[in-house]
């Protein structure tokens, strides 16, 4: 949690905060993000153990991708298309799935004029390299519901 609260609706032209106090990822009306607080816990258990114990399995983590594109980008907090392409392709390869196999992508989707186009272009490049099909995969971001939960943003996306 942000304590003491030192942020709010503090829009400045050219910044990452929303002009109207709403977060609209991948939307032409999106003008930035809104920060919020949150917490999330994801309990992980090996699939074989969960099945053995009769647990309800909500999801399976089949693969991961992790990288840092360092100085080859606009700023420390701004991703590059090339770095995003590499990490998305890495995650698909690690999971053993093709982009065409997916029906939903939960994106970071901050609704910023810098971040969303980079993320969308990277996804488009990876998907287009695999298939010419269109309209089979939905793109979303939990930030449209709860804003950018800062340190809990990754957990919120996984939980969604």
Q: How should each PLM-predicted stretch be described?
A:
Residues 1-160:
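Condensing-enzyme catalytic core of the thiolase-fold
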